[in-house]
Amino acid sequence: NKALRLTYTGSTILGAITINVGSGTTQTQTQAGYPTLSGSLPLVKTGGGTLVITAANTLTGSTSVQQGTLQLANAAALASSKVIPLAGGTVSLAPYLQTTVGDLAPNAGGLVDLANGLVTVASGLSPTDLVTAIVAGRGDGSWTGTSGITSSVAASDVAVSLPRAVGWLDNGDGSVTAAYAAPGDTNLDWQVDVLDASNFLSFGKFDSGLAATWLEGDFNYDGVVDVLDAADFFGTGLYDAGNYNTPPGASGIAAVPEPSAATLAALAVAGWAAIGYRNQARRACRHDR
């Protein structure tokens, strides 16, 4: 499974670390002959099987997934590498993993499956390109897109009418984050609480028509915050319910600040607006029949 291959990039021929894992097979990087991945040579994953990156590697060369699945299973698995899932290739996260990659090309034709985890891209990926990838992965709303960024866990949840999605953050330092999330979880801490309510209200984007982000309350990726997003916020039933993405054996309870009277009042207004919108939509639907 260990091979040296020549790749042509522009006018330069470079060596590459090629790891082939056959269909129906799962191997860790150690089993594939690479207990550590380091240096500047690119890594190329081939074959229809799954390669699991278990170590904290220092590889600075790019990582391309041509076929099959490359699963990240360490918080620093490819912290300095640009990860490129090509058409026919998938990058996935181990359950509940929170990891960092050096860069990510989620619009290169392949798929990134966050499962119920979180990935931070250190540099190189713009918020615009990140949202483009998320919208592709969302597909028709079922989170079963064949390219971009998706979540197989969100897809399973949505299939049983449990509202889940992929949330995202522009961290302000050149890095961006994407994670399995519930609508309303503005800060991606896997809770919907007063901090999220404050974000939804304090940024002043609700019904303003101004461009907005997930942090500011845009949960359906249409670039604005409106009654549809308020409906998404309240539709999860998760407000003040604790952690909704707790690993087995871990506590799902965390202390949060008490909401102010003003926050509660504003939430009530937004909530009633969302309820009114839903009732209006139902009446219109009955009328059409």
Ranges and model annotations:
Residues 7-17, 177-186, 216, 257:
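Short domain-boundary/entry signatures in modular proteins, especially
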Residues 261-279:
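A cross-kingdom C-terminal cell-surface attachment/processing module
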